[in-house]
Amino acid sequence: MQDLKTYLSTAPVLAILCVSFLAALLIEINRFFPDALFLSLSFS
C-alpha cells in the first residue's frame, strides 16, 4: 500500500490525473454549452 501511495504521488502521475480531470471538465461544459467558445460568453 505504501508503494502505491508513493507511485500515485509522483509528478507524472499527478500531471496526467490533473490533465484528465481538466479535459473531462471541458468536455462536460462543452456538452451543456455547445456554442460557447468561452465560459464568460455562455452566461451573457
Curated annotation (Swiss-Prot):
Main location: plastid
Cellular compartments per GO CC: chloroplast thylakoid membrane; photosystem I
Coiled coil: none
Membrane-spanning residues: 7-27
Any one biological process term the GO annotation gives: photosynthesis
Compartments reported by the entry: Plastid, Chloroplast thylakoid membrane
Pfam families assigned to the protein according to its UniProt record, in alphabetical order: PSI_PsaJ
Keywords: Chloroplast, Membrane, Photosynthesis, Photosystem I, Plastid, Thylakoid, Transmembrane, Transmembrane helix
Superkingdom of the source species: Eukaryota
Record membrane topology: Single-pass membrane protein
Function field: May help in the organization of the PsaE and PsaF subunits.
Family according to the record: Belongs to the PsaJ family.
Protein name stated in the entry: Photosystem I reaction center subunit IX
Organism: Pinus thunbergii
